[in-house]
């Protein structure tokens, strides 16, 4: 059985619980070989706070023109650690540009430990995408940070969009 929902003009981006569900459905989603399973955070706690992410050059249609950005985003999960069944799967995902987002520390280095890496995922990975870039799963919540006023350190009167809004623009461009 293969999931036929992802047609030539359709894309899927799911975060948090949707990320967990889609990672379990990887066997029926084309181009998701080597995707991880989601496991309990290393901290054994629900993590609900802000973290920093680096946007990588990837095949994900959602992050075009965002490469090398370092952005703050909320996380809210207890089971967000991406566990790969084989290190060769992880290597292949990196080689194929299927790792759109990674947690980084305050210096911009890949976060390999808590608290900058809120769940303990290898190499700070917070997102993977399908080989064609149409399906992307991620644990963080950029939908909670696409308006400047959603970010506590910004001027609440700033009615503009944050850099995360580009993700939604990219999806719109893809389907048009």
Question: Predicted regions span which residues?
Answer:
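Hydrophobic or amphipathic alpha-helical targeting/insertion segments
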Residues: 13-31
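Short acidic (Asp/Glu) patches
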Residues: 30-40
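Generic recognition of cysteine residues
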Residues: 11, 16-19, 37, 129
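Glycine-rich, phosphate-binding/catalytic loops in enzymes
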Residues: 29-32, 154-156
């Amino acid at each position: 059985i293969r999931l036929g929902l992802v047609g030539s003009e359709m894309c899927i981006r799911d975060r948090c619980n949707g990320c967990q569900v889609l990672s379990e459905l990887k066997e029926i989603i084309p181009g998701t070989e080597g995707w991880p399973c989601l496991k309990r955070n290393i901290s054994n706690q629900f993590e609900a706070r802000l973290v920093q992410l680096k946007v990588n050059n990837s095949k994900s249609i959602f992050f075009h023109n965002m490469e090398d950005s370092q952005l703050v985003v909320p996380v809210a999960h207890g089971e967000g650690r991406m566990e790969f069944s084989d290190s060769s799967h992880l290597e292949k995902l990196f080689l194929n540009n299927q790792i759109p987002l990674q947690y980084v520390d305050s210096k911009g280095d890949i976060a390999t430990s808590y608290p900058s890496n809120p769940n303990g995922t290898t190499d700070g990975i917070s997102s993977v995408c399908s080989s064609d870039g149409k399906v992307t799963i991620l644990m963080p919540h950029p939908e909670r940070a696409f308006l400047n006023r959603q970010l506590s350190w910004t001027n609440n009167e700033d009615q503009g969009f944050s850099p995360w809004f580009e993700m939604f623009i990219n999806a719109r461009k893809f389907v048009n």
